[in-house]
Amino acid sequence: MIHSSYHHKDTYEDSKTSSVFETMLMLPDELFWGVLRTACFDNENLPVVAGRIEDYEFWPHWDPTHTTNSTLVEPDVFIRFQSFDVIIEAKYSDRPGQYYQQWKNEIIAYSNEYGSDKPLYFIAVGGNAEKMTESVSAIKDIAITKCTWLSILIQITKLRNEYEGLSTISNNQSSTIRLLNLIELVFNIHGVYNIRWFDEIRISKPLISPDSMMTLKTFFK
């Protein structure tokens, strides 16, 4: 939570946003974007290739002209890739908290700062009442793509498992595994866990019968 401390942000939401994304941004650029894109529920509008991350900023202060804000507009995370820009608006939990006017204000304020030189994508993390993509008409139509904290963690876990399953692990891959473990720990600290089913855990001897596992799963449908 380096960035939340630097910006004097002391809410649970700000600490979670800072801790998760500042560690995720340590991943190689293509892995970071791959995780974030795949975590989104309806990601067909998001490019597969992003290119290099040129810059990023937590809680930038943008010009509020033509918005409903009076002093500034402050998205949570702003990332400039080679090919496009991304606004990330994050909410602490999955209880409804995202709302149209905030999205619209951030898109207008982005246009005030950067014009329309690059394509803009908007990702709403957490706080979504529905999973399907919405559209905001502000300067131009922008799709609001959605995900949850858990859907991001699931992709982090999958990627880590893929690396650990390699027959030979390079030094770079080893450091990536350590970073993915750290990111998972950050999620856990903030109350987000990826539950692993019993039949996915590698053990030498079965601890529970297959019938019992199927019975347990029925309680979590």
Regions found by a protein language model. Name each.
Residues 1-221:
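Charged, terminal alpha-helix-loop-beta segments
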